[in-house]
Amino acid sequence: MSTYNKVKGSKFETDVMKFLRSLGHFAERLAKAGSSDEGDIVTIIAGQTYILECKNRKKLDLPAFWAEAVKEAANYAKARGQVVAPPAFVVVKRRNASIADAWVVQPLSEWINNIERDINANTNGRDQHDGDLGTKAGGA
């Protein structure tokens, strides 16, 4: 990878980190460690840790980007003695668009698993809702 591309990628990572921070979320860039990379950014949103792999490239190779994100999330967990890796996402820069309009990519099955995990975590000990938009289970 050329120096120009490294600078471009590094700037995108920094922009993503700053955007997350501007919304009040913890976000840090992670150090590069070759085959032991742990992702580009770790962020904590609503108490959940996420690993972000940021890509600022003209040519998209989503399967390769996703494989890298999963591997690096596993490296992150392993380095901290965690059994389960945090959810990983690929953040892809959109041409001629703001950082807020970057694409966030994850396979559908992973996304569903994350949604179900978050719902289960957020409904333990709280009022649960039925499928009727905002109506509490057991009556209105």
Give the predicted meaning of each segment.
Residues 1-140:
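Catalytic phosphate/metal-binding cores of nucleic-acid and nucleotide-processing enzymes, i.e., regions
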